[in-house]
Swiss-Prot record:
The gene coding this protein: foxp1b
Ranges of biased composition (kind: Basic and acidic residues): 641-659
Organism of derivation: Danio rerio (Zebrafish)
Role description: Transcriptional repressor.
Low complexity bias: start-end ranges: 387-404
Descriptive protein name: Forkhead box protein P1-B
GO terms for MF: DNA-binding transcription repressor activity, RNA polymerase II-specific; RNA polymerase II cis-regulatory region sequence-specific DNA binding; zinc ion binding
TM stretches of this protein: none
Region (CTBP1-binding): 365-369
Amino acid sequence: MMQESGTEAANGTAHQNGAPPSVEGHREVRSKSTTPSSDITASDIINFQQHQALQVARQILLQQQQQSSVHKSPKNNDKQPATQVPVSVAMMTPQVITPQQMQQILQHQVLSPQQLQLLLQQQQALMLQQQLQEFYKKQQEQLHLQLIQQQHGSKQQSKEVSAQQLAFQQQLLQVQQLQQQHLLSLQRQGLLSIQPNQTLPLHTLTQGMIPAELQQLWKEVTNSHVKEENSVTNNGHRGLDLSSPSPVPLKNHNQHGSTNGQYISHSLKREGSTLDDHSPHSHPLYGHGVCKWPGCEAVFEDFQSFLKHLNNEHALDDRSTAQCRVQMQVVQQLELQLAKDKERLQAMMTHLHVKSTEPKPTPQPLNLVSNVALSKTAPAASPPLSLPQTPTTPTAPLTPLSQTHSVITPTSLHSVGPIRRRYSDKYNMPISPDIVQNKEFYMNAEVRPPFTYASLIRQAILESPEKQLTLNEIYNWFTRMFAYFRRNAATWKNAVRHNLSLHKCFVRVENVKGAVWTVDELEFQKRRPQKISGSPALVKNIHTTLGYGPALSAAFQASMAENIPLYTTASIGSPTLNSLASVIREEMNGAMDHGNSNGSDSSPGRSPLPAMHHISVKEEPMDPEEHEGPLSLVTTANHSPDFDHHRDYEDDHGTEDML
């Protein structure tokens, strides 16, 4: 009240001097900064104007309620005077600056640019108040005429009056919020200094909002508010009171309120459209007869009782506002978690679909000594296997075969030439379950499938309805099932043609369509590895030459026999066996001193080829028909690296070798 009296005194002084109050106030601040009048700021003036507008609105609403009560008792109809505009409303009109006064201010440069901008914004607020006053007068005239007509009217006319009164309330609240928005914008720009004891009404609802958003907000709220108020007014559950605004728009404010001054405008639009789409008996906070307000969970028999509960228990108060803020924080946390999960999923998909350019570090392979210890506990019939390691192997699906081990590991032979390791054809393990289980992975990721060309060709033919395919159909199956074969077509297609022509299990049949390829299963099974032919003393000779003696179990002897199928009796006792023993002994002794990751990659293009000991070890057995004579496991020390390209018909190019 002291601020209001001081403001009125300042306004009176300004009117007597013939200058606007805001300009006079600024002059006093600049000339007499030490006087008590400098405490009166523009925020005080705006707060006083808002207080006056609020009093006017309350007086008008009280008069309207009295008129409505008089309308209910017809005996006192003649005694009710007409509604008039209070005098306090007319007192605010002379504060508008005339064009002549504005020109004088600009010529004399009385105000600084910031003060001039503040003055203009204040004048805009005053113009809005004048428009509201004119609206008051029109509404009062219309209400007075309608009250006279309602004495002989019907209930339908009373509904229209209630709707107009509701519109009047909304216009009043809209003007108040616009004024408050101007004040907050001035505060952000540093043009106003709000004292701690000064209150900012509707601060949490309007902070961070621009006038366009505010108009859109009230446009949406008004539509839903009019619908709700019409239904509630018809049932007679509530009256019109400015001090207790309607729960419907305030609920929307709570749901889309501000957290730390940030207003979510797109959520408001989405919520408004969602509420419009709901059926008359559905509500986002109502489901299966239970109130979904956080912490409520009250049970209701019908939708109308839920609406009563929502309007009464969850109206705008401190508790509901706090619950709404908590819910907003929960939603924000969930959105952050969702964003993190989406980013993680995108990274996973990118990693799986894009082939890595850097080789991944592979797990430390087991050396020969550890395999000897493992082979003692393993069954003698289980052959040692190894899953090929490629740069993309860590992303490939791991089958049970990945848990087996190799006797001669890539690390232990890092200085040895190309090593071919395949498990599907050698150990009679079908590739159908693996392809079916990891079909989507092979179709999308550029990962080299761990199968031989012969196995893939056989699988393609067996999957066909007629168990026969043309060469072009085989090509199409490769590109359809494996993303790896959608590039470098010239390389792998040449390898497919070599396998079809060299393996006896693939039979070429001429028919009406042309030449088709079929599979001879009996011949395909003959390609399985054979036991070492010749004297059984070969195994004993091998492990005694290596120097391990009785440390090698029977299972390891069988493993050695499996991994050296090309060794025949012709090579027994030859000097090459002693050379093999010395080389393997040297490599085994130095295997623990270095773990070169490049050695784990068996591709010829990535394996180091030193000047000495170019040894090519091939585990896959080849048919005797494919060679001109018996081949020894170990070649000469100066063996050419091109040996594999001439001998290995399954892979035409070393860089595209199937692992």
